[in-house]
Amino acid sequence: MKSLRVLLVILWLQLSWVWSQQKEVEQNSGPLSVPEGAIASLNCTYSDRGSQSFFWYRQYSGKSPELIMFIYSNGDKEDGRFTAQLNKASQYVSLLIRDSQPSDSATYLCAVN
């Protein structure tokens, strides 16, 4: 019985640590419709001011998410038609997709570390 109590305490401590490590992230909701050739803007806000790294993933239907951009310092980071923008003071990160194409139709996810 003593070993069961010790095991439960250890499990509780591990769950408490996992719970404390969760960060709240919010993306703009609903589908975004953009004309071909236009700029698509996706936004994400986060709650933890200590967050250091920010990631954007693209997921095509039936496929696994793929990393398309990451950013860790304020300002803009460009990669081809994609630009990630980070403002740590306002706690937001955005993804701009220039010259939108039909192949850009996917689910976009932001993540914070």
UniProtKB/Swiss-Prot annotation:
Keyword Signal: yes
Name of the protein described by the UniProt record: T cell receptor alpha variable 12-2
Residues carrying a glycan: 43
Leader sequence segment: 1-20
Localization of this protein: Cell membrane
Domain Ig-like residues, every copy: 23-113
Keywords, ordered alphabetically: Adaptive immunity, Cell membrane, Disulfide bond, Glycoprotein, Immunity, Immunoglobulin domain, Membrane, Receptor, Signal, T cell receptor
Tree of life domain: Eukaryota
Main location: membrane
Quaternary structure and partners: Alpha-beta TR is a heterodimer composed of an alpha and beta chain; disulfide-linked. The alpha-beta TR is associated with the transmembrane signaling CD3 coreceptor proteins to form the TR-CD3 (TcR or TCR). The assembly of alpha-beta TR heterodimers with CD3 occurs in the endoplasmic reticulum where a single alpha-beta TR heterodimer associates with one CD3D-CD3E heterodimer, one CD3G-CD3E heterodimer and one CD247 homodimer forming a stable octameric structure. CD3D-CD3E and CD3G-CD3E heterodimers preferentially associate with TR alpha and TR beta chains, respectively.
InterPro entries, per database record: Ig-like_dom, Ig-like_dom_sf, Ig-like_fold, Ig_V-set, TCR_variable_domain
Classification via SMART domains: IGv
Disulfide bridge map: 44-110
Molecular function GO terms recorded: peptide antigen binding
Chain's role: V region of the variable domain of T cell receptor (TR) alpha chain that participates in the antigen recognition. Alpha-beta T cell receptors are antigen specific receptors which are essential to the immune response and are present on the cell surface of T lymphocytes. Recognize peptide-major histocompatibility (MH) (pMH) complexes that are displayed by antigen presenting cells (APC), a prerequisite for efficient T cell adaptive immunity against pathogens.
GO cellular component: T cell receptor complex
A GO BP entry: adaptive immune response
Species name: Homo sapiens
